[in-house]
Every structure is written in C-alpha cells, then in structure tokens.
A protein has these predicted regions:
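Transmembrane alpha-helices and adjacent helix-loop boundaries
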Residues: 1-325
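The feature captures the beta-strand-to-loop junction immediately N-terminal to the Walker
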Residues: 372-374
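Helix-to-loop junction immediately C-terminal to a conserved catalytic motif
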Residues: 387
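Conserved ABC transporter NBD signature motif
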Residues: 395-404, 414-415
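Catalytic Walker B motif of ABC-type/P-loop ATPase nucleotide-binding domains
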Residues: 508-512
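A short, surface-exposed alpha-helical micro-motif characterized by mixed small hydrophobic
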Residues: 549-551
Length: 588
C-alpha cells in the first residue's frame, strides 16, 4: 500500500471515529484541543524547523486571533464567521509589524526578541479594559451553521480538523515550491541563499506572517470552543509549550506537528492529574516532566519523533521530472565590448587586517581565468567582494560595464553572476535535483498563494526541467533523486556547480571546485568548463590543484598576502620567480 493510500485511510478513520457515540466526549474534546494546538505547531515547523527562526512568542499570535474575535462578537455583536477574517487580518498586521523588526535579528537575539514581544502581548491582553483586563472575556458565542449552534465537542471536532487538514495541505504545498525551497535555504545561512537571488528579509517575513496567521486561526477556534478568554493562555509559557510540540514531533516535519501536539497535549492532561497525587502537593510539575522529555528527545532523536514513524511507512516516491518541459529563460546574454568583469584597485579590510589590497584584473567574455595563491592570500575574500557578500571598502568592480561594488548579492545574481563556495552549502535533506532547482529561483515568480493552491505547477515543471538539464550537463543525472547529504564531498561540489548553472549566468565564480574530486572526475569537470567557455560563458576559478589550473585556464592571476604578484598565461606564471617563491615555497 502506498504512503498516499495509508494517509487517506488514516485521515478518513481519524475524522469518522470520534463522531461515533461510543467514543467518550472527554477524548473528543482532547482531540479538539490537539487540533487547535497543531495549527500553531504547523506554523512553528515552517518558522523554526524549516526556516531556522526560533520563536518563543507564538502564543501571542494565538491571543491576537482569540481576543479580536472575542471582542468583536461579545462587544459589537459581530458574527463569529465575520470575525474570522478580522482576527486573521489583525494577527497578520501584528506579525508584519513585529516581524519587520524581529526577523532581522540573528543568533540568540532572535529568540530573545520573540520572548520580549510575547511578554508585552501578555500584559496588553491582561490590562486593556476592552479585553476584560485580568478577568478576561466570557460568554463568547459559539459557532453556528445554518442556525445550528456548534455546541459540544463532536460538532466542533469537524470544524477544527477541517481547518487542520487545510493547513497541512497548504504547508506541504508551500514546502514543495520555489518559495518553500527558499525558506529551507534560510536555515543553512543567508550567504548561499542570497547568491542565487533569495531576498532574505522578505522570505523570512513571509514565513513569519504565515505562521502567525495559522496561530491566529487557532486563537479564533479556541475562543469559540472555550467561550471564555484569559491572558494566562497566551503567555510565554504557553509559547514554549507550542515550540515543544514542534520540536518533539519533528521540527522540520509537517506531520510531526500533529504528532507533537497530540503527545504534549495528552501528556499534559495526564501529568496534571497524576503528578500532584504522586508528590502530595499541587504545582506545575508537568513543566519539569516536559523539560526531561525534551532533553531525552534531543539526546536520542534530535530530528524529533516523526522521522522514526516515517521509517515504518512505505518509501516516498521520487518526484517525477518532465525533462521535455521547456527550460526556464535565463538573464539576457551579456557580451560587452570591453571586459565582462573588471576590478580596479579593490581593497577589503577586516578591522586592522587588510585581506585584499589594491587588486586589479579583468575577465573577458568566454574566458577562463584562474585565481591562485597560498592559503590566506585573499582569494575567497575577493570572490565575496565580486558577488556582493562582503563588498569592497575601496576600488571599483564593474560587470558588463556597470558598477556593482555596492550592489546586493541578489542584484548581482540578477545581472548574471553565479557562484559556488569553498565550503559546500547544500541542503542535505533535500534531493540533489531540489538543491539544483534553487539555482533557478530568480527565474520563477510564483508567490505564497500560488504555492499553497498549487497554481505554480507549470512553473515548477520548467524549473525542474532546467535543473535536470544542468545535472545531465555535469554528469550527475543518475543521482538527481538521492539526498544531497548522501553524496561524497566531490560530488557535492559538482552539484553546487549545477545549481549555479541553473541561473544561466554570464559569469561563473567557482571556489575550489576540484577539491575532493578524483583524477577522472577532475578531467570531466574540466571538459564541462571548456564547454561552457565554448558557449561564451566566462569563468573565474579559485583552485589549489596546479595541474588542473594549468591545463584549464586561459590566464592566471596570483595573489599573496592580499596583493597581486603576477598575471599572465599559465606557462608564464608557472615560471615566474615571485610565484615560485610565494606559492610553491621556493621549490623550482
């Protein structure tokens, strides 16, 4: 039986069985609460597990949705169904404002920021008179359909789990899209994502707001199920509980959110009843138990519990690739009259250290130029200056006649500059072809709504056809459906080249592409690069393998201590005394 069939049968049983009279209402009510919590956890899977942004304040967004609906329905007589879009809009606007500030933080400052506004929201909910102050809001009307009030746990069960089902589908569709791959790239760091055109701040804000809107929907459901609100349900401790659900279930797994929500909600109910009896005194002992549980899971199953469950299910089928689909168009071919890339007096400092000092050289159209030098010579720093990751402090960098030394990596990528990295930057859990498809990010246009509704399928077919063509070009078509993390280091470097080629660049920057490759693989790579040159693409390559460089490059530029000490044809550079002294240690 396929994984899809198992999922459909399980979902059908899950939706029908709780409606049977033989199932106690207590358990149905518990499942209602699990569904509400699962909505928040799904958002946290996208935000934290996939996007790498830890949030302890997600309960505040549940509160925004709940209190908006509570105030509108009790104070102004608005229908709960009309209050739903208002609740989601208020939550979305609040997330947009808070996210515009918060998502730009990095490291431990981001979770600290979420704690700060989580505490602030808690005090707002508990002190504003319109929200009932510390007494909260009571007598919130229940949902109704066609005059039938959804009072009781069984009717509400249907509403809650329809919402959860739609949220799961939307989240899965989002992750299987151009935008979803960009979100996954965030967790690996901004440097690689920026290099193939992902707008980091915008992408972070999109997933932040989407996760908040799911929490706002959960708040709306909670308000009309509980029918009373108090600020205590939306404090930082509740936010930590939601984060625990995502981590326990599997922080990067959508179905893990359901598993984590179920496990934590049931355990909380059981522990709140039994632990006070065990200790002979009342108290929040379940928090201690959850702390122990979290430590145990982080030690024994760092990816959460869902991957353990997934191993018992049939293997997921590989994504079908329509190689006949038309490839995505690249940027217009750039053939300037002068050099394609020109550096003039480029200088880069890090504090008192001058990493690159007044370097000048040019790369012509259809030319392979190698940049060599001992470790610490400034080669990768120069690459970062050209690609906009670490802009030059002084000097000029021109591409196709236009200055780019102050442009962002995204804008430089749009001009037709692609690069690889000294330290491989792939997403290990994604397949090879999905990693390569990231390189075509700039050529797609589908946004959040199109991704969730699967209106982007034609664009996706073209993106994956482009990725498949580039994998075939570099000789890795047979590995396209393997997880990138399963490849050898040398193969990973070639995958990075295929990803860069998906941009269809005019200039390709390669940082140590032959490292980790066997001799035959190096020969094959050299043939690929010669083929690119024959088609008019320019290549600037940093490499330590002198045999590889000497047999490939048209010209070689040599750096030492951040300064250019030689430039010329391979034979000329090889015999240069300064190069022999600096790069080869004086050995003739």
């Amino acid at each position: 039986m396929s994984r899809r069939a198992i999922a459909l049968l399980s979902a059908a049983a899950f939706l029908v069985v709780p409606l049977l009279p033989i199932v106690p209402e207590f358990w149905v009510a518990l499942l209602d609460y699990i569904g509400i919590a699962a909505l928040v956890a799904i958002g946290l899977v996208l935000l934290t597990g996939v996007g790498g942004m830890t949030s302890f304040g997600q309960a505040a967004f549940v509160g925004f949705g709940a209190y908006t609906s509570g105030v509108l329905t009790t104070h102004y007589g608005v229908s709960p169904w009309l209050a739903l879009p208002a609740a989601m809009a208020v939550t979305g606007v609040a997330a947009l404002i808070l996210g515009a500030i918060t998502v730009r933080l990095s490291g431990h400052y981001l979770p600290l920021g979420t704690i700060a506004w989580g505490i602030s929201a808690f005090y707002v909910f508990g002190n504003l008179a319109i929200m009932g102050g510390h007494d909260g809001i009571t007598n919130i009307p229940p949902l109704s359909l066609g005059g039938f009030k959804l009072i009781g746990v069984r009717p509400y069960w249907v509403v809650v789990w329809i919402a959860v089902t739609l949220a799961v589908i939307a989240a899965l569709n989002l992750l299987d899209s151009r935008l979803g791959r960009a979100i996954r790239a965030l967790r690996q760091g901004a440097v690689a994502a920026e290099s193939f055109g992902v707008e980091i701040a915008r992408t972070k804000l999109i997933v932040f707001v989407f996760a908040a809107i799911l929490a706002g929907l959960a708040g709306w459901l909670y308000a009309h199920f509980q029918r009373s609100l108090g600020a205590g349900a939306f404090g930082v401790s509740a936010g930590i509980g939601y984060l625990l659900m995502a981590v326990v279930g599997g922080a990067g797994q959508v179905f893990g959110a359901l598993l984590g929500a179920g496990l934590v909600t049931i355990l909380r109910d059981v522990l709140q009843d039994w632990l006070p009896r065990l200790f002979g005194a009342s108290g929040n002992y379940e928090d201690l138990a959850f702390g122990i549980l979290l430590i145990a899971i982080l030690q024994g199953a760092r990816e959460g519990l869902w991957p353990l469950v997934a191993r018992l299910l049939p293997a997921q089928r590989s994504r079908a690739v329509d190689e006949a689909a038309p490839a995505m168009p690249g940027p217009p071919s750039t053939r300037p009259d002068g050099p394609l890339l020109a550096l003039d007096g480029v200088r880069k400092r890090f504090g008192g250290l001058v990493a690159v000092n007044g370097v000048s050289f040019a790369v012509g159209s259809g030319e392979i130029v190698a940049l060599i030098g001992p470790n610490g010579a400034g080669k990768s720093t120069l690459f970062n200056a050209v690609s906009g990751i670490a802009p030059a402090d002084d000097g000029r960098v021109h591409f196709a006649g236009a200055p780019i030394e102050r442009e962002s990596p995204q804008h430089i990528a749009r001009r037709g500059v692609a690069r690889t990295f000294q330290h491989v930057k792939l997403i290990p859990e994604l397949s090879v072809i999905e990693n390569v498809a990231l390189g075509a990010h700039l050529h797609g246009h589908a946004g959040l709504l199109a991704a969730m509704l699967r209106l982007d399928r034609a664009e996706e077919r073209r993106i994956f056809a482009t990725a498949a063509a580039q994998l075939k070009r570099v000789g890795l078509a047979g590995n396209m459906h393997r997880a990138a993390g399963q490849l050898a280091l040398g193969q990973m470097r070639v995958v990075e080249i295929a990803r860069a080629l998906c941009l269809n660049p005019s200039l390709l920057l390669l940082d140590e592409p032959a490292a980790g490759l066997r001799h035959k693989e190096k020969q094959a790579l050299a043939e690929v690069l010669r083929g690119l040159r024959a088609h008019g693409m320019s290549v600037l390559v940093v490499e330590h393998d002198m045999d590889f460089v000497m047999g490939l490059a048209d010209r070689i530029v040599v750096l030492d201590f951040g300064e250019k000490i030689a430039e010329g044809a391979p034979a000329t550079v090889r015999d240069d005394p300064a190069v022999i002294e600096a790069y080869l240690g004086g050995v003739a």
